[in-house]
Amino acid sequence: MSLKGALVAREHPVLDRLASGLNVAKGGVEELLWPTRCVLCDVPGTLLCEDCRLEIPYIDALHACPYCGQAYGKLVCIDCNSFMVAHRQLAPDQRSSMHGDQGLSREGGVSPRGSESATEAQGVCMTDGPQRALDKVVSVFSFVDPCRKLITVYKDKKELRLAEVLAEMLANYIDPSWVVPGETALVAIPARKQALRERGFDHMKEVGVRLSKRCSLPFLDVLHTVDRSDQRGLSASSRQQNMKGSFAFNPQGLLRAAGVIPERVILVDDVLTTGATLMAAASVLKEAGIEQVFGLTVARLP
């Protein structure tokens, strides 16, 4: 029997409706006993109240670094610009400041003293050296209090309902230029095996599946982890070293895409610290034949 036939054979409308009704009843009883409260301010009603939504330090894409997504990086953030200088693509006197008074112009060129185009600079920043695998990164908000609580409550206190809240946020930050119908798919950074055993769920896979439904993009489970230590508490250089060989490509995850490797992937993770995790995973995806990989994270360190 084909996969499609097997799925059809398992459909039982009456049982499905009964199960749905029981779930609704269960949810109603739980809500009476344990009312939903905002995870940030504890006000009853929703997981994230409107007042707290307005207080979240969202990163304005118009003022963020166009390459790594750093908040207020404006035209090119210091980190990315330093990377370009180190690779001799921009002269030291062409460094852009955080105010954007030198460096890339809004029209797409560099400062009057430079000759490189924005496209060339972007290629250097995100496609050469250690960052070659990522084409661009976007983050929703800065990982600061009280917003970091959204992620820690979701991951460590197993509030799975927050997966939908995070998926909604991510959906609003997907760059439309990344999406080409039939060519773009979603992939989530998989949880470490130890974390999966401790939590009982893969937190970014849960978010990725919900994001897939919101954006009508296929979700591909094509990455799996190779044993490594926890990244938390490690320095930037230690993170880079720790991530080497930490992911492997799983071709069986392409079954939902009829075995076809997508041209573009939006790679989803929770927090961007140094970028080591995203870069390691993106490298594996590109080695598998994916042409472009865009990073999308819920938060990033300021």
Predicted segments, located by residue:
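Glycine-rich phosphate/pyrophosphate-handling loop used in enzymes and phosphotransfer proteins
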Residues: 1-302
